[in-house]
């Protein structure tokens, strides 16, 4: 399993004092308030400040004090170590643990691997790449079992729900 988990992607600078604008990839943006340290490119960084905009988080990182410094971080990911990650509810998983899983139907037919998770308004959708590309809704009526330790997901046969 991944040692570090992405909690957001740096999408732009904010202001002229080195703040960065982050698109959160966590469903609980309030966790950023308690974030004292994170990782960017495997290097630990100290978080000095946090504020919110609709759908975005603005962070101030120690040592990043100019717009030029902040610009160099654009398109990088803010990550936390797994042991410092938020505790998940039952039947909830980190994206890093889902992406790469092999998907099978209940008849043990291999359908492909999860390449990406698409966030929609109502539920996530797993983008499966294999012999055919598939979009699988991440809902209980379709997903039978998720085993992140063995990187295996079982779904109902396509003809049942498609």
From Swiss-Prot:
KW rRNA processing (keyword) present: yes
Source organism superkingdom: Bacteria
Example of a GO biological process term: ribosomal small subunit biogenesis
Annotated localization: Cytoplasm
Keywords, alphabetical: Chaperone, Cytoplasm, Ribosome biogenesis, rRNA processing
Principal location class: cytoplasm
Natural source organism: Clostridium novyi (strain NT)
Family in the record: Belongs to the RimM family.
Entry-linked Pfam families: PRC_RimM, RimM
Protein name, UniProt field: Ribosome maturation factor RimM
Name of the encoding gene: rimM
């Amino acid at each position: 399993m991944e040692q570090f988990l992405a909690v957001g992607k740096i999408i732009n600078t904010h202001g002229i004092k080195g703040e960065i604008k982050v698109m959160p990839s966590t469903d609980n943006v309030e966790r950023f308030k308690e974030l004292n340290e994170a990782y960017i490119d495997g290097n630990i960084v100290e978080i000095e400040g946090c504020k919110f905009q609709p759908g975005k988080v603005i962070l101030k990182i120690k040592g990043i004090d100019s717009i030029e410094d902040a610009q160099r971080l654009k398109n990088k990911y803010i990550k936390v170590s797994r042991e410092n990650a938020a505790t998940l509810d039952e039947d909830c998983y980190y994206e890093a643990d889902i992406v790469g899983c092999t998907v099978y139907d209940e008849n043990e037919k291999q359908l492909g691997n999860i390449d990406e998770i698409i966030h929609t308004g109502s539920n996530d959708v797993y983008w499966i790449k294999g012999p055919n590309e598939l979009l699988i809704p991440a809902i209980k009526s379709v997903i039978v079992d998720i085993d992140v330790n063995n990187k295996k997901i079982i779904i109902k046969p396509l003809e049942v729900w498609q």
